[in-house]
Amino acid sequence: MARSPLPWLVIAAILALLAGVLVPSLVVGRSIRLADDVEFHAVTEPAAVLVETGTTTVRMDNTYTTSPNEEDDALVQLDTTKDFYRMPEGQPENRSAHLSASLTLNRESAYPEAGHASHQSFAVRQLNLGASIDNGDMEGLTAFFPADTEQRSYPYFDFIAQEAVPIDYTGKSKRGGIDVYEFHQHIDALPAQDILARTAEYATENDPTFTPEDLRRRGRAGDFYTNEELAHFGLKKDTAVVLDSFYSVDRTVTVDPATGTILDLDENISFVWATDAKQARDTSIPPERRAVFVGDLHWDQTTQDAALELARPTVRLHKAMGLVSWVGKGLAVALLAAAGLTYLRRRDHV
């Protein structure tokens, strides 16, 4: 009597099911960890922005570099820099601001790892301001989102505000054939005095000549406001005013949800002198004489293409593993069906 194929069909079905479940899970789980060898350079389109001396052209260069953590494979070191360059027509470009940061990220969540100090340094030529900052536990996302990004809000760290502010999911679209999520963050008229106080709390090195009074302007309203603004705000030219600086930003981030890679970044930044937050929010008239920095910075197309290429191999791998999972589970069902038929036929012959 021939040996029944039933046991082999059952074993094959179990193996197919395991292959369809375990292999994709292991491969995808390994692939979504934040890589420890990322080198990414982002550049914004040259943009016309308002500054205290008038309109100028500016671009921002941003680098992200990850490297292995020597103590724990579950962590990765992130080093990032931001450089703002003025590009005066007919003159060499010059760096007007620089920021660098070094922190330890969790490779699974992309958040700063608790208990690991971060270091920042920045210099702003226009304000004659510079500082080095050692934070305890920095909170919020920075250069990456978590893999398997969800349609929800996340805390996102703003290096100027020096705090994590929610960034909200706003919708999805497609970029280069990839499904992407869009997030938006709004920081509203934050007084620079508050930023300075927050910075001073962790500062290890400050410019000793810089004081809170340097973030304030005093004088006649006519020295700071155009005639149109004077009428709009109900001020007279000889009215004495005290202006503080306020920081606002509308930030739109486009993310590949499979890998957490940021694919596009748009930042509408407003740093202005104003009597109060309400006046700082009023952008109905361009603040031609009150602008520290007012402009929209958006990644250029080359940067967007490079970000897509950074994410695409993992996206393809996930699609391939989805197919492996479907085939494995389908084969398991087919083999179990064959085993069932074999069992019924065998029982009918008994």
What are the language-model segments listed below?
Residues 2-130:
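Solvent-exposed N-terminal domain segments of exported/luminal and surface proteins
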Residues 2-10, 24-27, 316-350:
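Juxtamembrane interface at the cytosolic side of transmembrane helices
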Residues 12-18, 35, 146, 171, ...:
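Glycine-centered flexibility motif
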Residues 33-41, 144-147, 226-229:
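Proline-rich low-complexity regions
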Residues 115-132, 201-215:
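N-terminal short leaders/motifs
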Residues 127-162:
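Short N-terminal edge-element motif at the start of the domain
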Residues 154-271:
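Membrane-proximal low-complexity regions enriched in glycine and acidic/polar residues
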Residues 236, 240-324:
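Membrane-proximal extracellular "stem/stalk" segments
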